[in-house]
Amino acid sequence: METKDGFLVINKDKGCTSHDCVKQIRKLLNTKKVGHTGTLDPEVIGTLPIAIGNATRFIQYLPQGKTYIGEIKLGIRTSTDDIQGEIISQKSWPKISYKQLDQYFNRFRGIIKQIPPKVSSVHVNGERAYKKSFRNEIFELAPREVKIDELILMNWDQINGIIEIKIKCSAGTYIRSIARDIGETLNSAGCLLQLKRISACGFDEQNSIKISDIEKEKGKKNSKNFIIPTISALSHISTFVLSNEEQINFWQTGREIKVDINYFRESKSFDYKKPIKVIDNKQTLLGIGFLNKEQSNINPKLVLNAK
């Protein structure tokens, strides 16, 4: 497979870390410039977008929402807030109806505050929380604001105390914390039983591939190219086209581009605070800029092939 800039959407297997996937891709594509768009815990499967080449510079401009399907086991509290952790306590769960359980979920819809798991990558005094936890240090984590755009009750196994959910949330949301807190809200306990990420950063599982798929194509003369072009991953961002060589030269030397402000005012959905992708007439991505509406300029923020 020919290496070029863009994104690979990996369907991660259980037991593999996000960094493991990055290392394998680096080796398979023989390139060092590879990075993932957000960590998936080793036990979590599913969608892991990986940036290749210059696409690594555009990760921050991807959509930040993520969607998961998972199962919560009531009655068990663990050290890691998932089933892999040490059991801390056990408690019975309430015998409530599907409708009643869904009403409890209202507390977890919209903007909420959650405390991350002790075993997480959150920084505490300059160190990852999981490192302190592994040393059995005593520490507290501050609540963090996250947004739950959608929380759907998929199934309620009252006999075994297992809840299946679908959740669409902002980046930085810990589903293990959701599982723990749902258990506490029900005057019980809870931990995450299993989890699959079905979409992340604008990519979904329908476009995902296994790393083994790349391995099979390696060395073939007419191998499949699974890399999604960076410009395709930025389809949610407004576009401005540089129409002549003078404008392109200005852009590539880091100078602002004069624009007709009405070009953007015609778009009702345009937000002046959001980034703009800049391209040429051949649909080649040139970078990212921001509009200065007072001066009617696009100011370069990220420039590809800078001079």
From Swiss-Prot:
GO terms for biological process: mRNA pseudouridine synthesis; tRNA pseudouridine synthesis. It catalyses: uridine(55) in tRNA = pseudouridine(55) in tRNA. The active site is at residue 41. It is an enzyme of class 5 (isomerase). Its EC number is 5.4.99.25. Keywords: Isomerase, tRNA processing. InterPro entries: PsdUridine_synth_cat_dom_sf (IPR020103), PsdUridine_synth_N (IPR002501), tRNA_psdUridine_synth_TruB (IPR014780). The keyword S-adenosyl-L-methionine does not apply. GO terms for molecular function: RNA binding; tRNA pseudouridine(55) synthase activity. It holds the Pfam family TruB_N. The keyword Repeat does not apply. Disulfide bonds: none annotated. Responsible for synthesis of pseudouridine from uracil-55 in the psi GC loop of transfer RNAs. Belongs to the pseudouridine synthase TruB family. Type 1 subfamily. PANTHER family: PSEUDOURIDYLATE SYNTHASE TRUB1, TRNA-PSEUDOURIDINE SYNTHASE. This is tRNA pseudouridine synthase B. It comes from Prochlorococcus marinus (strain AS9601).
